Amino acid sequence: MAAAAAALAATEPPPAMPQAAGAGGPAARRDFYWLRSFLAGGIAGCCAKTTVAPLDRVKVLLQAHNHHYRHLGVFSTLRAVPKKEGYLGLYKGNGAMMIRIFPYGAIQFMAFEHYKTLITTKLGVSGHVHRLMAGSMAGMTAVICTYPLDMVRVRLAFQVKGEHTYTGIIHAFKTIYAKEGGFLGFYRGLMPTILGMAPYAGVSFFTFGTLKSVGLSYAPTLLGRPSSDNPNVLVLKTHINLLCGGVAGAIAQTISYPFDVTRRRMQLGAVLPEFEKCLTMRETMKYVYGHHGIRKGLYRGLSLNYIRCVPSQAVAFTTYELMKQFFHLN
């Protein structure tokens, strides 16, 4: 993380020169640039995850084969959860999700912009490749910084009404720390998460950025419009942003999904009866493949992930593009 922080610091815009009140220009745009970029990414992440929170809960239940819902499909589970736990059951774990997703989204989008600049200026890598590299690095940075919050969120989402191991976020933190190896207990499943996040974030940012670049290059009038904060910059129209974000999410999710399944099982740890057979990433993937195969194991719940990932990424990229204009980041 120190290396990541140093890399980000290397591309921080220089301090703005004092200007008269109300003055615009490049210097004014650099005022609190990091804070504005951080807020834009955080808001984008929260909007995206709130949109698909019920689907996230169902995904966790299906991936880990919760015994109450193991024989049900995606839509059957969506109907069964409210009957058993009430409609708020679809949002179980969402409080922890919001606490995690704001810094996650903020760090990821902010890091992407800075890594992209760093890779281009310091390494001389340009074209579309720098988006792939910057996206992968940004995703890994965000994961490492916020992983303990995701661990707690998954534990809370896996609980079923009447069978609570944890009473809330703070209790979950205390219990995991006390019973699962202290601080390291919060990082179970980190390796498959990083291995899954690198291609996911990389492909996601690469696909969206490439579609945006190609679209604005070949059909600027049809697909684009001037940015509200900087008329000299073309941005995609909102509905085109949504489409490009959805396509990017679908492609990225297909590539990285087996790592996501592995991560969830490792995060749940002692909550699962087969805990001792899933201590490492290799053991977990071997267990899931051996007992459930590819379609019902490593790719179980993928249909749900398409349903949740496409709108989630569409909303995330679109909201971020709008926030960039609102916070004068273009």
From Swiss-Prot:
Mostly in thyroid, liver, lung, kidney and to a lesser extent in heart and skeletal muscle. Solcar repeats lie at residues 32-118, 126-214, 236-326. The chain crosses the membrane at residues 33-52, 95-112, 132-149, 189-209, 242-262, 297-317. Keywords: Membrane, Mitochondrion, Mitochondrion inner membrane, Repeat, Transmembrane, Transmembrane helix, Transport. It is found in: Mitochondrion inner membrane. One of its GO terms (molecular function) is coenzyme A transmembrane transporter activity. Pfam families: Mito_carr (PF00153). GO terms for cellular component: mitochondrial inner membrane. It is a multi-pass membrane protein. Disulfide bonds: none annotated. Belongs to the mitochondrial carrier (TC 2.A.29) family. This is Solute carrier family 25 member 16. The gene is SLC25A16.
